[in-house]
Amino acid sequence: MNAITILVVHHSPTPTARGIADTVLTAARDAAAEVAESMGDASQVRIVERAALEPDVEELLAADAVILGTTANFGYISGALKHYFDSTFAAAHEPTAGLPVSWWIRGGYDTTGAEKAMRSLTTGMNWEIAAEPVEFVGDPSEHADQLVTMAQTVVGAAVMASEKEK
């Protein structure tokens, strides 16, 4: 199997948001380790973390799947994640069509506008939802299992897609 890259792009400006990102990153890394153990190669799945304010088009073009994370701010995704899309769209929307994606959105009061925006942006990129997005308000610990499942499912989708390409 060729190396598979899962790109985790997020904006996590608070300890609460950082904790959500850490939960997702740990789950993705654990899933990658399980793949390595079952398939015998520790370098098969790489988890790459990217701050949304520091977009890297080449990194996105090399990704086999993407997990996005943001807070819901004033009814929209974070400006940082919008900046990521603005900075990568022109170069990446055609070459990454069909890319498996999922995301988390955590709001203090409401995530409705951010959910709509995320679906519009990922649809505009022609990405395919690989796992049920985790969109919630309140205490992240109440959604930890969903976050873990989402991350594991995205890793699994990327591995399955890679196996089909063989």
Regions found by a protein language model. Name each.
Residues M39, E128-K166:
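Glycine-rich phosphate/pyrophosphate-binding loop and the adjoining helix
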Residues A31-D41, A92-H93, A161-E165:
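Alpha-helix termini
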Residues M1-A3, T96-A97:
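Short, flexible coil/linker segments at domain boundaries that flank nucleotide/cofactor-interacting
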Residues T14-P15, I105-D110, F136-S141:
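Short histidine/acidic/glycine/proline-rich micro-motifs that form metal-
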Residues N2-A32:
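N-terminal beta1-alpha1 ligand-phosphate binding loop
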Residues E34-E54:
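A short beta-strand-loop structural module common to alpha/beta enzyme folds
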Residues A52-E128:
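Helix-loop-strand module that forms the ligand-binding subsite of alpha/beta enzymes
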Residues P15-G19, Y76, T112-G113, E142:
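Residues that form or flank phosphate/diphosphate-binding pockets in enzymes
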